[in-house]
Amino acid sequence: MKTGFSVFIAVFVAMCFSWSGFVLGPVRQLGTEGQTNILNSSDIYPNQRPGAATLGLQVYRAYGCAQCHTTQVGQDGVICNVVLTAAGTKSAAVSNLISTLKLTGLTKDEADAVSGQITAAGGKTETHIVATGADISRGWGPRHSVAEDFLWDNPAQLGSVRVGPDLANIGARYNADWEFMHLYNPGSEVKNSIMPPFRFLFKKEKIDGTLSSDALPLQGELAPPAGYEVVPTDDAKNLVAYLLSLRMDVPLYDAPFSTLAPPAAAKKK
């Protein structure tokens, strides 16, 4: 009897520790997460997703998009690049000094030391922070994903398998026209794409006077019969709204990087 009771107590204690570590701990750590400030700005991140994008999250979930895509960018580390912004009145001396210095791929301490040398010579510099890693080099995002990126997602669609590319920052890479065409005929937008077409998210309608503004520009064998057009359904519009809301292109305290220029224009066919 004593042995049975001891085993019960041991199992109960083990379960309590497991529950505390795997359930209570994460809830206490992440359950209080809130909006944060963009680095060096008073702007708040993230903004709540628009209504269509919130509905689109449920479409994304319903059709199992997370089975083939992740929304979490990884990162190995950061490097610092020192950039000369002004040579000052001793430009020749500064130029000669720079020719002897390593300016890229530095640690923070190395970058501070190099900047100090250039400043002492009369020049002015900026230190640019650049995230590194396989996902970064693929262009999937400028930094790693953090908890705040998923603040408004319930449930968060992290995914674990990458049959297709990561989508954490896809809203900064493509526009709505591209997304609709990619859903209808993936191969027309991505060469050798293995993604199945989602044509059931579109409908064929008779043209009423003029072509609808959201009609797909289909050609060749994909074109509808004369007098008809192919337009997205509400599910397609909401899904695309959600995909366009997936952006993590702002620097945060937990994931800094230097914004060198305004985002490039979204790709359009």
Which residues fall in each region the model found?
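Sec-exported extracytoplasmic/periplasmic mature domains
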Residues: 61-65, 70, 119-123, 168, ...
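Electron-transfer interface patches adjacent to heme c in soluble/periplasmic c-type cytochromes
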Residues: 12-19, 85-89, 96-98, 104-116, ...
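A short beta-strand micro-motif
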Residues: 80-84
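Post-cleavage N-terminal segment of exported redox proteins
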Residues: 1-50, 131, 240-269
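Surface-exposed patches in mature extracellular/periplasmic domains of secreted proteins
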Residues: 67-71, 125-129, 192-197, 250-259
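Sequence context surrounding c-type heme c attachment/ligation sites in exported
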Residues: 53-66, 223-237, 250-258
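Short regulatory "switch" loops immediately downstream of catalytic or recognition motifs
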Residues: 70-77, 199-209, 250-251
